[in-house]
């Protein structure tokens, strides 16, 4: 009997339709970097609230310097000194200037700032009581940052859904926000299945292997914006698996297992989901990662990945990562895809869509993007995944690609929404 394999796009749609953004939490603005705002951020005051100097120098009336030149310099009286955080309480009149520091408010009457380096100090230290000479005119607004140059009070400085950059945290602080609301990091329960598995710090006996998938999946979960919770290794025992899965479902927003997703005698996980929840699919037309179960347990999304490291990695990238990003409120949930030129031939005999580990680089001479497959696509090898920066996507159907053919690559080294 032929296996029922669903297309990857259908599987992705099913997964995304069964997850929703998490509840809102309020966090410090600096912790919001990298995540989308849940609500519009509105400035409570003008940013900047006053016109200020863009550099150290002298605040002047440009009208006083209209005739200034090297042959006929203009001398002004220094009537005060103003640093950032200090306000000169007077006003500048004809023939007067104020020594000013970067960021300080431009005094009343002044409409320009002349940088310190091109002003000649005739006597004193250049501060109040000194006389200074100018040898060139100053333009209105020269070296002056206007009030409300960034935003007016009441303006939206960052829209809901916009991802906060590190500089954006500063913008939010300028707008009066010490904290902002974002969608909470979903808790993702991770369970490794298999009697043959031992913890990474243990020396495996004959027939045993170290559990590498849990470390990789926790790192991938954290990178996607979620909080990984590891529930340990479950042996090939229905009761042990059920106990861990039940606990994870109760405590987490999303549950992921690796191992126990194929048709082996000891693969109990799909049977558990069928018995206690709902299986929405259990095979995908994809390599690696054909044997993937997705369903609902206790109303929570459940994803059963293959125990093969490469299959688990690709399954996470294609299904779990987009789901986690949706739960965090991101509008962009898919990795960027770009075209590159193959450096070698690739032959595919199977119908399934392939995602081969590869590296894409730009030719330094021509600027052309070139993609080279890893030498081996063995699904048990982790080094090729560590060193790959893309997945070479080869769509359904047998094919034979030649060096020089243009192909699609999924950039796993770039964040979603990257413009290429």
Give residue ranges: language-model regions:
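Helix-rich terminal scaffold detector
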Residues: 1-8, 178-305, 309-315
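Flexible glycine/proline-rich
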Residues: 25-30, 39, 85, 106, ...
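Residue-level signal for inorganic ion chemistry
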Residues: 15, 57, 154, 190, ...
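Short, glycine/charged-enriched hinge/interface segments at domain edges or termini
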Residues: 2-3, 8-9, 59-235, 370, ...
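Short, low-complexity N-terminal leaders and the immediately following helix N-cap/first helix
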Residues: 1-69, 99, 330-355
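Generic secondary-structure signature for well-ordered alpha-helical cores
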Residues: 13-24, 38, 42, 124, ...
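Solvent-exposed alpha-helices and their adjacent loops that cap or buttress functional pockets
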Residues: 51-53, 66-71, 89-93, 106-108, ...
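Generic structural signal for well-ordered, non-membrane alpha-helical segments
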Residues: 4, 8-12, 25, 29, ...
């Amino acid at each position: 009997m032929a296996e029922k394999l669903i297309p990857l796009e259908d599987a992705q749609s099913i997964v995304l339709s069964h997850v929703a953004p998490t509840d809102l939490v309020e966090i410090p603005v600096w912790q919001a970097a990298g995540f989308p705002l849940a609500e519009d951020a509105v400035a409570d005051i003008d940013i900047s609230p006053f016109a200020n100097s863009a550099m150290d120098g002298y605040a002047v009336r440009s009208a006083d310097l209209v005739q200034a030149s090297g042959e006929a310099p203009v001398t002004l009286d220094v009537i005060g000194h103003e640093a950032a955080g200090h306000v000169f309480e007077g006003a500048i009149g004809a023939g007067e200037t104020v020594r000013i520091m970067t960021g300080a408010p431009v005094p009343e009457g002044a409409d320009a700032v002349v940088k310190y380096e091109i002003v000649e100090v005739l006597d004193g230290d250049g501060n109040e009581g000194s006389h200074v000479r100018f040898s060139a005119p100053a333009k209105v607004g020269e070296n002056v940052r206007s009030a409300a140059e960034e935003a007016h009070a009441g303006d939206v400085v960052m829209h809901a859904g916009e991802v906060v950059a590190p500089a954006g945290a500063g913008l939010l602080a300028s707008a009066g926000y010490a904290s902002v609301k974002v969608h909470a990091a979903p808790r993702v329960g991770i369970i490794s299945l298999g009697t043959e598995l031992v913890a990474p710090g243990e020396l495996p006996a004959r027939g045993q292997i170290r559990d590498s998938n849990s470390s990789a999946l926790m790192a991938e979960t954290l990178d996607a914006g979620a909080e990984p919770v590891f529930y340990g290794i479950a042996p090939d025992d229905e009761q042990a698996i059920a106990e861990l899965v039940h606990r994870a479902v109760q405590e987490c927003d999303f549950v992921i297992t690796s191992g126990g997703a194929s048709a082996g005698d000891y693969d109990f996980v799909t049977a558990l989901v069928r018995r206690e929840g709902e299986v929405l699919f259990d095979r995908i037309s994809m390599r690696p990662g054909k044997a993937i179960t997705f369903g609902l347990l206790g109303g929570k999304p459940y994803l059963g990945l293959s125990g093969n490291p490469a299959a688990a990695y690709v399954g996470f990238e294609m299904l779990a990562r987009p789901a986690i990003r949706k739960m965090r409120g991101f509008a962009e949930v898919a990795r960027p895809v770009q075209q590159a030129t193959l450096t070698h031939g690739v032959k595919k005999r199977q119908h399934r869509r392939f995602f081969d580990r590869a590296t894409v680089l730009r030719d330094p001479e021509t600027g052309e993007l070139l993609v080279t497959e890893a030498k081996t696509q063995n699904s048990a090898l982790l080094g090729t995944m560590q060193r790959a920066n893309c997945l070479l996507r080869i769509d359904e159907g047998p094919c034979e690609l030649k060096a020089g053919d243009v192909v699609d690559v999924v950039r796993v080294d770039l964040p979603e929404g990257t413009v290429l």
